[in-house]
Each structure stands twice: as C-alpha cells, then as structure tokens.
C-alpha cells in the first residue's frame, strides 16, 4: 500500500507494507477530507472506515490480488475511498478520464479487463454505450449517483454496494509488496490508442516523499488540487497520495471554478493549491475582481504547460510570491521542479 511506513519484517527477508492510516486515525482528530459542495468532512478514522467498506465489498464480490478497479469519476469522495481501498487490498486502481467517449471507454475496458467498473450518473449514457461496444464486461459495475438517476440495468448504486460491508480492516489471503502495481493511468493516446502506465506501491511512496520534501508538506497542511485526479499531477502533486500519506487534509474541488477556489482558500485556510497555468490565470482575474484573503497559502503549484515570465510575475504579485513550477505530471511525475527560489530572476 502507498499508505505505508516501509519497515523490515522480522518474519521475512523483504520489505513489507505497514499501513500508516491507522496511525493517523489514532493521532489525528482533524479532517482528512472536506467536500465543500456537500458540506461534509471525514476524519482519518471515518475515511479509513469508508475505504474498508469498499475494500470488503469488492473482496466479497470476488476480486483477487492484481484485479483492476477502473473508475471514471470526477473528483469526489468515492474516488478517494476506491483509491485507498485498492492499496489496502492489493488490487489496482485505474482512474480514467471522465471526458472519454464511449469508444475510448470501451478500449480501456478491453485493455485492462477490470473486475470492477465505477461510473458517475452524469456519464451514464456514454458508459452504457461503451459496455455494448466492449468485448469484455466487468464482473461488478457500480454507479456513483449525484443526481438521483437510475443505474444502468444490471448495475448497482455505490451506496447499495457498500451498505452491508464491514468497516473493519480487510483480511487478505495474499501478501503485499512494495513492487506491486497499485495504480494504472492511461496515456492521452497521442501515438495511437491510450496505453496503461503501471505505477507500483514504491513509486507512489516516493512520489509522496518528493512532495513532502520539496513543497515541503506535512500533517499541518491543507491542499486542494484543482485538476482532475485521474492523472499523476492530480493524484500526486498535492493530491490524495501525498496529503493522506502526510496526514494532511484534502479539500475536494469537483470541477474547477476560480471564484470558489479563492473562497475555499479563505474559508478553509488552505496552504497549497495546484493547477495548470490557465488555472492561475483565471485565479488572478478572479482575485483582481474580488480579492480574498490568501495569506494562509504556502504555495501555488503549477504544471502541465510552460509558465511564462510575465505571467508568473503577475501571479506572484496578485496571488502569492510562492509559485512552484513542475514538469512531467501526466504519467511519470516531475522530472523538473522549480521552487520559488529556483525561478529565474524576475
């Protein structure tokens, strides 16, 4: 699991994964995750229980080690529950772009052959068509319902799927390794069809440490990633992985909204927000129209496209002088990362 402290086992000659989530449950009473949209918050204990319910539900449904849980979700609590559950159970979390067409969804389903597929009610029509196109059908298909919609025939609502599942830590009949595949991300397909990128447990642990060292990031921090969580930058650049690993708090932004982002910084005292340069441009425009108190920010982290000098100077003047710039956040994670003091002279 990526939620681990890696320690040497006295009963085996290899590194084993010891989950740090129970430690956070015992020592951290503050929120692990906040959904401003639904005005809901989860402590680490509550987050652990929700992840355990999904873990036990997929185990009861027959998933085995290495089985794939594919989910096409906007940023939402169920994304976090499923992501953690996969690490707990030795299964593979496979988040895919919620903007994919039916044909593209079918391609990823055929390629990864997921045991479990989770979709949002707003994508119901595309998913239903994809299931007809695909030559492979997942064993369990689950709908996250945001709109009171009826699920596709033969599928089940998420709330019903986990309703009777145990909130206790799952019992596994297999061992976990830091070299297990824990997450699979799909490329944009610029050289043909999308291709799955394997990310192992140790990849995710080291990505979390990278963030904790370079931001730096700790259990005192509160983050909000304004980008979708289905790519490396969304998950690992101040997203779910490093924030939960460090014991900080994730604030969910379902879909980017500049005015709401600034409001959440002020209301929830956020310390880090993450987005592409286009996001920073819209934040700057919104801040110039209606200024918010951004004094709690330790930094704004940008990625995804070049950061121009003149634009960077404007963002530093209007938002915060603490602008970070990373490169390589689609599937690989940073291969270049500039902290505020690393930026060229302005």
Predicted regions and their residues:
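Flexible, low-complexity linker/hinge segments
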Residues: 11, 128-130, 149-181
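AMP-dependent adenylate-forming
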Residues: 19-43, 150-153
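Conserved AMP-binding/adenylate-forming core of the ANL superfamily
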Residues: 32-76, 80-84, 101-106, 110
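Conserved AMP-binding A3 loop
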Residues: 41-45, 182-206
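Structural core segment of the AMP-binding/adenylate-forming
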Residues: 60-61, 81, 88-160
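Conserved pre-ATP/AMP-binding loop-to-beta segment of ANL
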Residues: 143, 163-186, 193, 216-222
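Conserved AMP-binding/adenylation subdomain of ANL enzymes
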Residues: 205-222, 230-272, 282, 286-288
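Gly/Ser/Thr-rich phosphate-binding loop
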Residues: 270-275, 285-346
